[in-house]
Regions:
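C-terminal-biased regions
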Residues: 1-79
């Protein structure tokens, strides 16, 4: 069983992004949890949005590392 707290990390990451001056980026992540109907849909939306945020290149290294980690875990869960 996978005990990783995807939603908890996503919420914490969204808050960290907002606190670091990237409120729109944080809203992208939290929005996926609000907009998705099923767990799979939420995971797919978060994975896509995280990929877009990673491609942006404006974030500090610590947040990039957290985005990559969550993106990787979501990718593993969906494949």
């Amino acid at each position: 069983m996978n005990a990783y707290d995807y939603y908890g990390e996503a919420r914490a990451l969204a808050e960290a992004l907002k606190n670091a001056g990237f409120p729109a980026y944080g809203s992208e992540i939290s929005g996926a949890m609000d907009e998705g109907e099923t767990g799979t849909e939420i995971f797919m939306m978060m994975r896509a949005r995280l990929a877009n945020l990673l491609a942006d290149g404006k974030l500090p290294p610590d947040l990039i590392a957290r985005l990559r980690a969550l993106h990787g875990r979501l990718n593993d869960a969906l494949t």
